[in-house]
């Protein structure tokens, strides 16, 4: 473990430590690997041009903007795509780590080590996670104690075709959870030949306080009857050790995840009896264990076990009148075990609880029925239109059987939501298209509400496009937060509901332009503005006591810049800058920022490829992050967290066809983000918003066929 030291520039800042002595042979190897992509980049200048087939073209098709496939340049939304090739070059522990390079997206870490995904300045609660257009979000009530299940459960990377990220509201097609944006994982389907992949990987830390981890995954696509029946099988296993980040007081920091694992198996059966109809059945089961070595700064180790079930069946039709898509889905997340152990061996506050499938400690369950029809219409001299209509019904429940002395203990809370939507994308000519639509949602608690959307796209030439639009959003509170009394108590902190809570309402506006510069580069510049009414939050009404509230009004505005080039002498560049300013503009907290997300984010990545070799170097910088409650509950006294930049390098080698060896050195400059300062008389606070692992080496081997 690195010994704590005191930086020379400050008397009250302490680091998790830098070793004064020479590192082991492995550490020397890490430093040697640091130079590899730099040498590769230099040599690329003198290499022959890369085969464009190795790179994605500037034209990309997406489905998340409207529910049907179209060119991303004409899609009525701001979108980014992460490809399977990009996923293969970096460690992917969850969905957050898979899309961490996307501009406009901020990835945070909980104290259990899970990712949180925030888009355009709003918390992860406003981001809808989907797999093939099916929602994976569960009740926010399951996100207690730093566990965020929505980003943990994902298909094996070898099964993923691409991940689409829609920045901005998408409630019209996808529902109220998509107020901030959408992350849609698109998987491989219906193979007509035997295909698959197998991956084994490991991540090795340079410093002892961070945990090593390893895992394996596979995907098999089996054409049982060619072009008629296929079977897809998938599985994934990841395991990690415990992290032991220490404060100068000799105590474990709160963001020190315990050891854990993530296991997933699934299968998909697809039947295409004729060219017009496709039927499918998909099942998935995941087990997860995780926790914190010092939960809520209470010197207690907390470990939790979860089971997640997902079963869905659906139909896709291609007919003369249009395309139909429908499915029914059952999604359930159970907390099945919990263990709390005191870090102080003299104390006897050990506790262990168990649940079963029929009687879990806590459970979130939802049933969804969804149907959609996409119809192309010819309008003669007025152009053409694609009309999308549909609806969905969602019944969700939550029950907490844990002994929390709350008014909802053992009570099954439920909510039913029905929705219908219609949206028309009118292609007036080759240059202009307009999208207008609306969604009507009904809740058995809050009644009916309508959310409209309008979007305009102008593409005066092939290389230039302009987009702009306005959309409304609507989000109902968690049912448990509507109770009149205590709904949760955890490690000395109490949370009270509020029966007067109102649903959130929002209006979002955006304008952007994309230019392709001579077929060499693509540049997108855009701005956005979102105004919330009755934004849901909580306020501290007494020490360690919180109550659910509505803020009066909250605004988020910003600018996004994205740059992407084609290969030039084997090298290409992608990068982005995001400015986000979020502020409470009405109520008791007027003038404050609603969260700790960065105001400025800068990302840059350079890729190189030649023959069997690829290499990359990338950086991510975050600036101006506010502290929610300076000096309170272990947070730092200053109003802001420190800025930081993280640099990663990596690459791959394909020695023979179908065999790929990939590597990465993460945090290559070994930026130490576990640096502490005094907070109050007895506690310490990290001066950075996230605990980012020190320098580490990731190695991966993949066989595909």
Report residues per predicted region.
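Outer-membrane beta-barrel translocator/receptor signature
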Residues: 144-147, 158-161, 167, 172-184, ...
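Outer-membrane beta-barrel signature, preferentially recognizing the C-terminal barrel domain
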Residues: 298-318, 364, 413-415, 459, ...
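Acidic, small-polar-rich N-terminal luminal/periplasmic segments of exported/outer-membrane proteins
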Residues: 54-193, 511
């Amino acid at each position: 473990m690195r010994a704590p030291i005191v930086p020379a520039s400050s008397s009250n800042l302490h680091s998790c430590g830098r070793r004064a002595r020479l590192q082991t042979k492995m550490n020397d190897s890490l430093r040697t690997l640091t130079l590899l992509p730099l040498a590769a980049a230099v040599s690329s200048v003198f290499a022959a041009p890369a085969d464009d087939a190795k790179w994605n073209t500037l034209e990309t098709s997406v489905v998340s903007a409207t529910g049907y496939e179209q060119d991303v340049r004409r899609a009525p939304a701001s979108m980014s795509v992460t490809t399977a090739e990009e996923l293969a070059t970096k460690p992917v522990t969850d969905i957050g780590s898979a899309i961490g390079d996307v501009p406009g997206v901020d990835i945070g870490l909980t104290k259990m080590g899970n990712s949180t995904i925030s888009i355009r300045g709003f918390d992860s609660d406003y981001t809808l996670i989907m797999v093939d257009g099916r929602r994976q979000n569960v009740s926010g009530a399951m996100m207690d104690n730093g566990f965020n299940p929505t980003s943990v459960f994902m298909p094996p990377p070898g099964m993923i075709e691409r991940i689409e990220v829609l920045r901005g509201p998408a409630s019209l097609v996808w529902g109220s959870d998509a107020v901030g944006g959408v992350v849609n994982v698109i998987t491989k389907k219906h193979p007509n030949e035997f295909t698959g992949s197998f991956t084994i990987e490991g991540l090795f830390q340079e410093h002892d306080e961070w945990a090593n981890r390893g895992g394996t995954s596979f995907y098999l696509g089996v054409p049982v009857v060619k072009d008629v029946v296929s079977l897809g099988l998938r599985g994934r296993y990841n395991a990690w050790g415990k992290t032991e980040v220490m404060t100068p007081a000799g105590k474990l920091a709160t963001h020190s995840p315990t050891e854990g694992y993530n296991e997933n198996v699934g299968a998909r059966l697809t039947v295409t009896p004729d060219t017009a109809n496709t039927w499918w059945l998909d099942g998935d089961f995941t087990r997860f264990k995780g926790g914190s070595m010092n939960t809520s700064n209470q010197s207690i180790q907390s470990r939790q076990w979860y089971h997640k079930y997902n079963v869905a069946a659906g139909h896709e039709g291609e007919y003369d009148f249009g395309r139909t898509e429908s499915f029914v889905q059952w999604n359930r997340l159970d907390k099945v075990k919990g263990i709390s152990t005191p870090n102080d061996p003299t104390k006897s506050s050990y506790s262990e609880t168990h649940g079963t499938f029929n009687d879990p400690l806590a459970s979130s369950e939802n049933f969804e029925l969804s149907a959609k029809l996409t119809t192309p219409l010819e309008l003669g001299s007025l152009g053409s239109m694609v009309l999308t209509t549909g609806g969905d019904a969602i019944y969700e429940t939550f029950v907490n059987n844990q002994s929390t002395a709350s008014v909802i203990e053992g009570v099954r809370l439920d909510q039913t939501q029905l929705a219908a939507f219609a949206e028309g994308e009118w292609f007036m000519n080759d240059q202009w298209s307009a999208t207008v639509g609306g969604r009507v949602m009904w809740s058995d608690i809050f009644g009916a509400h309508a959310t409209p959307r309008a979007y305009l796209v102008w593409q005066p030439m092939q290389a230039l496009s302009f987009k702009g639009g306005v959309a409304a959003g609507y989000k109902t509170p968690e049912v448990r937060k509507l109770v009149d009394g205590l709904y949760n108590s955890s490690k000395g902190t109490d949370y009270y509901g509020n029966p007067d809570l109102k649903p959130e309402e929002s209006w979002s506006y955006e304008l952007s332009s994309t230019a392709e510069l001579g077929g060499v580069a693509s540049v997108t510049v855009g701005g956005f503005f979102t105004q919330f009414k009755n934004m849901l939050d909580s306020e501290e009404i007494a020490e360690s006591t919180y109550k659910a509230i509505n803020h009066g009004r909250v605004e988020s505005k910003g600018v996004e810049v994205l740059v992407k080039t084609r290969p030039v002498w084997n090298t290409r560049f992608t990068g982005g800058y995001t400015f986000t300013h979020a502020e409470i503009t009405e109520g008791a907290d007027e003038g404050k920022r609603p969260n700790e997300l960065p105001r400025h984010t800068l990302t840059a990545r350079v890729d190189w490829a030649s023959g069997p070799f690829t290499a990359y170097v990338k950086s991510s910088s975050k600036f101006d992050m506010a502290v929610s409650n300076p000096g309170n509950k272990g947070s730092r006294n200053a109003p802001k967290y420190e800025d930081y930049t993280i640099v990663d390098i990596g690459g791959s080698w394909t020695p023979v066809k179908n065999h790929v060896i990939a590597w990465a050195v993460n945090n290559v400059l070994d930026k130490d983000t576990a640096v502490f300062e005094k907070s109050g008389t007895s506690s310490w606070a990290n001066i950075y918003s996230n605990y980012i692992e020190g320098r580490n080496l990731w190695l991966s081997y993949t066989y595909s066929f």
